[in-house]
Amino acid sequence: DYVCGPLQRLKVKRQWAEAYGSGNSREEFGHFIWSHVFQHSPAARDMFKRVRGDNIHTPAFRAHATRVLGGLDMCIALLDDEPVLNTQLAHLAKQHETRGVEAAHYDTVNHAVMMGVENVIGSEVFDQDAWKPCLNVITNGIQG
């Protein structure tokens, strides 16, 4: 099995920084990820009624997408600071426990994030063997 060791964590942080970018590219990146999520899990839209999951072009959903990516950005930044990362993951776990998010949903989002990063930085440099275990560290922490 692949591990999320110190080198993998640094690589994920570097590749994320390149993919996440800034400004308008962040909105496009979020749109790519959520389009992928809902394409592969249409029923997941129901979990986002409060933020207009029925239409990812609305200001309400775009704001939600920005918050999610901001949270992921923080978690990735903390990959090499485990005590602080674990505190952040516990906070996110509390926010998600009442939302009915299942393991398969996290898998779908992980896959969409990896596709998004690969789409921006290119398949020749994207390191799935680092991303998979490191995203699992984050999503396992959120699942509690």
From Swiss-Prot:
Iron among keywords: yes
Domain Globin: 3-144
The family this protein is said to belong to: Belongs to the globin family.
Protein name, entry field: Giant hemoglobins B chain
Annotated positions binding heme b: H96
InterPro entries assigned to the protein according to its UniProt record, in alphabetical order: Globin, Globin-like_OT, Globin-like_sf, Globin/Proto, Haemoglobin_extracell, Mb-like_M
Gene Ontology MF annotations: heme binding; iron ion binding; oxygen binding; oxygen carrier activity
SUPFAM superfamilies: Globin-like (SSF46458)
SUBUNIT field: Part of giant hemoglobin C1, V1 and V2. This worm has three different extracellular Hbs: two dissolved in the vascular blood, V1 (CA. 3,500 kDa) and V2 (CA. 400 kDa), and one in the coelomic fluid, C1 (CA. 400 kDa). V1 consists of four heme-containing, globin chains (B-E) and four linker chains (L1-L4). V2 consists of six globin chains (A-F) and C1 consists of five globin chains (A-E).
Pfam family, one: Globin
Cellular localisation: Secreted, Extracellular space
One GO CC annotation: extracellular region
Chain coiled-coil ranges: none
Record keywords, A-Z: Heme, Iron, Metal-binding, Oxygen transport, Secreted, Transport
Organism of provenance: Riftia pachyptila
